[in-house]
């Protein structure tokens, strides 16, 4: 893949630099991928190419394995397990694997006294995991959040800048290499960011990786109209991953948020990522940088390599598996936010009062209303900004609007984030 071949070239070009900085000699002894003869950006030594990655362990002496396949299960999991059991250090950018099997793999690494490093799994070139594990090690972190997916951040930024639809900007992102050309679903639906927030939670709060159901929404339903209305309100739409401890319970979520244009997070645009931690005694810490692509990812992979070569064997999640606690999940239905609701309705008398009455019935208090008629098509757009309300209230309320003939489309919901 793109990351693997870029890493291969970086290892060659920076071999002497790495050896000087660590005092250790390094050699690439084996490579494995699906297709030996595939055209690649850089030439590879086919003499050390293996079609079956597991065969490498029987024929070569390996100290460190880079796993850049990217699957949560299958050969990715199998080869990492095999390496750790055979006392081989592992470095991976695979967030899906770590988010799903990180605890199991961490136990294997600790049992066999080897390293499992995954700095590149979250926010590409930003050293956020090492910052949490080492730089903020004595702090009690209560909250971690940020922009964790460069694809979606580019799309939302470019929709605003170019005044183009989601569909057009997605195609542009695919041409530029910011979005997968085949199936970008895992970026767009929030899953990629969600895997990253799970890893950040485990590291920040010294807990086992959560398996509980959480709010996970992507940007597929964001329209150019929402971008324009947000702009009028002095707001921007960002896909945020958020994790915090509320009443000694873990709350994790990924969803689009309306943030102030004057806020720090509201000015992180394009393919950039940003991660913010809040804790004691340090207060707020911010890291920003490119979150994806072979360059930033390889940078983090090489930083993990240097850490291993310098002889440090550390628990993968900062503290040993046995000392990491399980924590109860916060009830998502009690999560509260102000809301942006956009309705497309028939332009007729009584529809607005119908909507506000329904909202009031479910304890959703209206803060602001914007109504834009479309006389030509006999319809109107109604945007409502609410005061804070719970997920339970909004879920129960919105289900009723599905059945009303005056509501032409199911309302678009975006949460406000302060």
Predicted regions and their residues:
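N-terminal glycine-/serine-/threonine-rich beta1-alpha1-beta2 phosphate-ribose binding loop
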Residues: 1-85
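A conserved regulatory-domain signal marking ACT and ACT-like small-molecule sensing domains
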Residues: 305-418
């Amino acid at each position: 893949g793109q990351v693997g071949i870029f890493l291969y070239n970086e290892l060659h070009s920076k071999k002497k630099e790495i050896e000087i900085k660590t005092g250790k000699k390094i050699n690439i002894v084996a490579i494995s991928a699906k297709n030996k003869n595939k055209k690649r950006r850089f030439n590879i030594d086919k003499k050390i190419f293996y079609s079956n990655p597991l065969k490498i362990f029987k024929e070569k002496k390996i100290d460190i394995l880079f796993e850049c396949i990217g699957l949560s299960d299958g050969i990715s999991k199998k080869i990492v397990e095999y390496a750790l059991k055979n006392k081989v250090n592992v470095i991976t950018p695979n967030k899906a694997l770590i988010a799903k099997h990180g605890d199991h793999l961490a136990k294997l690494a600790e049992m066999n006294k080897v390293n499992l490093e995954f700095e590149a799994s979250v926010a590409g070139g930003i050293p956020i995991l090492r910052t949490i594990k080492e730089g903020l090690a004595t702090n009690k972190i209560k909250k971690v959040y940020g922009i964790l997916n460069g694809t979606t951040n580019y799309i939302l930024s470019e929709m605003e800048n170019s005044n183009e639809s989601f569909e057009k900007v997605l195609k542009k992102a695919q041409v530029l290499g910011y979005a997968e050309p085949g199936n970008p679903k895992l970026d767009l639906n929030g899953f990629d960011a969600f895997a990253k927030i799970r890893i950040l939670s485990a590291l920040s709060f010294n807990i086992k990786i959560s398996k509980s159901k959480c709010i996970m929404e992507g940007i597929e339903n964001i329209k150019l109209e929402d971008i324009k209305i947000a702009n009028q309100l002095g707001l921007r739409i960002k896909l945020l991953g958020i994790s915090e401890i509320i009443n000694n319970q873990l709350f994790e979520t990924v969803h689009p948020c309306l943030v102030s244009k004057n806020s720090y997070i509201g000015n992180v645009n394009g393919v950039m990522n940003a991660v913010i931690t809040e804790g004691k005694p340090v207060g707020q810490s911010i890291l920003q940088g490119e979150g994806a692509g072979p360059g930033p990812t390889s940078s983090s992979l090489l930083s993990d390599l240097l850490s291993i070569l310098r002889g440090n064997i550390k628990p993968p999640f900062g503290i040993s598996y046995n000392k990491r606690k399980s924590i109860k999940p916060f009830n998502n239905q009690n999560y509260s936010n102000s809301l942006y609701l956009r309705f497309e309705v028939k332009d007729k008398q009584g529809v607005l009062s119908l909507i506000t009455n329904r909202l009031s019935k479910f304890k959703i208090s209206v803060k602001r209303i914007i109504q834009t008629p479309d006389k030509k098509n006999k319809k109107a757009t109604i945007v409502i900004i609410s005061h804070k309300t719970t997920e339970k209230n909004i879920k129960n309320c919105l289900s009723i609007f599905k059945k009303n003939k005056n509501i032409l489309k199911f309302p678009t919901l975006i949460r406000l984030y302060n």
